[in-house]
Amino acid sequence: MALPEFTMRQLLEAGVHFGHQSHRWNPKMADYIFGARNNIHIIDLAQTVPLLHTALQAVSDTVAKGGRILFVGTKRQAQDNVADAAKRCAQYFVNSRWLGGTLTNWKTISASIKRLRHLDEVLSSGEANSYTKKERLTLQRERDKLDRSLGGIKDMGGLPDMIFVIDTNKEDIAIQEAQRLNIPVAAIVDTNCDPKGITYVVPGNDDAGRAISLYCDLIARAAIDGISRAQGELGIDIGASAAPLEEELPAATAASTFQGLPGPRGTADDLKKLTGVSGAIEKKLNDLGIFHFWQLAELDHDTAHQIGEEVGLPSRADAWVAQAKSLADA
């Protein structure tokens, strides 16, 4: 993978250069405005191109270091694009109403997420049959309400390392919370917005559906590039250290060169689908930082065997890698 490429022509075709009516402008955006035509401000794409590239690089670098990206876009025309892009790159999103304190009061939000998980378990199991129809309906409504607000972050496991925002005016509370916590903000900033406090300003139309789709696609691809880079670096480290580790260190220590993830990227895969993996073995794999089939699929023979020894089933390791490749591609 490589950082996603784009052209000024793509930005033009998506309508990125169209700002708001000139009387609705924010003077702080003057440096990013090329001029006005028919009472509509035109954004200077000669500045947008390098600034967007900088934002994409920041996203890729953040993910490559194991960081989390939170997509934020609650306006109607952004909701689907934000959710789809975040899911595609195994990141997180808020596309319904932003709950005050989502970042600054994470402890309370975590309690709500715990409640959402509990409701999911109750409604998807036989336990739901012990409730009356009215009680089940009440629980379902509560679950749906929580899922709209928290469904995109229920697997985040902690504060994000960067947020990407569509429409800084509408998402001003999210931006203020990120600023208070020193979380970098990459944002699409239209001519009626205030760029102050935005870490990575990307001047552009924040209303056009095609423009929003383009932004989200590029950010998602940048995040995927970061994941690819992280895995590539992992492979290089293992290859470079394999020979000396075999000579100088016991096998159990060699397994420590595997750099697992701090938490699942999105929803963790069901590792119990692998032959011989019980709930207890799955937990051991999780403790080693393995949550997804693609992580196992990319292991070489020696590293897979070392991890197999760590969980007590070294003879299964090669089979797990083969199975994981099939399951990851499914």
From Swiss-Prot:
<dbReference type="GO" id="GO:0022627">
    <property type="term" value="C:cytosolic small ribosomal subunit"/>
</dbReference>
<dbReference type="Pfam" id="PF00318">
    <property type="entry name" value="Ribosomal_S2"/>
</dbReference>
<comment type="similarity">
    <text>Belongs to the universal ribosomal protein uS2 family.</text>
</comment>
<dbReference type="GO" id="GO:0003735">
    <property type="term" value="F:structural constituent of ribosome"/>
</dbReference>
<dbReference type="InterPro" id="IPR001865">
    <property type="entry name" value="Ribosomal_uS2"/>
</dbReference>
<keyword id="KW-0689">Ribosomal protein</keyword>
<dbReference type="InterPro" id="IPR018130">
    <property type="entry name" value="Ribosomal_uS2_CS"/>
</dbReference>
<keyword id="KW-0687">Ribonucleoprotein</keyword>
<dbReference type="GO" id="GO:0006412">
    <property type="term" value="P:translation"/>
</dbReference>
<protein>
    <recommendedName>
        <fullName>Small ribosomal subunit protein uS2</fullName>
    </recommendedName>
</protein>
<dbReference type="InterPro" id="IPR005706">
    <property type="entry name" value="Ribosomal_uS2_bac/mit/plastid"/>
</dbReference>
<dbReference type="InterPro" id="IPR023591">
    <property type="entry name" value="Ribosomal_uS2_flav_dom_sf"/>
</dbReference>
